Amino acid sequence: MKRVLIIYTGGTIGMTRTENGYAPRAGYFRAALDAIPDLRAPEMPEWEFYELSPLLDSSNMTVREWNCIAELIAQKYDDYDGFVVLHGTDTMAYTASALSFMLDGLDKPVVLTGSQIPLCEIRSDGRDNLITALLIAGEGIVREVCLYFGGKLLRGNRATKYSADGLIAFVSPNYPSLAEAGISIKYNEAALLPRQEGGLKLQTCLLYTSDAADE
């Protein structure tokens, strides 16, 4: 059975209601996943869960977090067949693009996804986005960093956020979709990257501080 690591960074998909609006809460989302029986269906890949700390609204995502995500994938690369990164929508496309260059030689799926409506709400789009992202990561047909949202799988460094309130939140104006999910997941084979040789090479981003900039 294929094994997938879910990396939860924060974002709308795992937020809960608070007195001050929606906010992420440590430990909540892992328990929420256990309440979705379809995630353990026979056709699903085996998955494990890793929660970053602290959880972030993606508007606060920085190069430091990009390095953390990329380093975690590199550390776990030989243990899993694919990866799903749960992320807020505000900077999801930026993170996907950054990871596509940081994970040089990647030959496994890294699928970023999230939701416009929290999983705790009845109309959440998070359940379908997560389940389909897990299936894509487990199938291993796409071997690159990509972004799945609203029925479309997009190349990570070609995606851009299109809508703040629509469920089809991302588009790829300059490159075709890698796959579309309807009754089945249909891959656009001509758009996929070929297999990579030579193994994964991690390229971390430099962190610049104000002190360094003044030197």
What kind of region is each of these model predictions?
Residues 79-81:
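Short acidic/histidine-rich motifs immediately flanking catalytic phosphotransfer sites
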Residues 2, 108, 143:
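Nucleotide donor/acceptor-binding cores
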Residues 86-107:
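Short Gly/Thr/Asp-enriched flexible loops that form oxyanion-binding sites at enzyme active sites
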Residues 2-75, 157-207:
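N-terminal glycine-rich anion-binding loop in soluble enzyme alpha/beta folds
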Residues 112-182:
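Internal gly/pro-rich beta-alpha loop/helix module
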Residues 208-215:
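Conserved small/polar residues in nucleotide/adenosyl-binding loops
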Residues 67-70, 74, 96, 100, ...:
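Predominant activation on well-ordered alpha-helical scaffold segments within soluble catalytic domains
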Residues 11-13, 87-93, 152-154:
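Gly/Ser/Thr-rich loops at beta-strand to alpha-helix junctions
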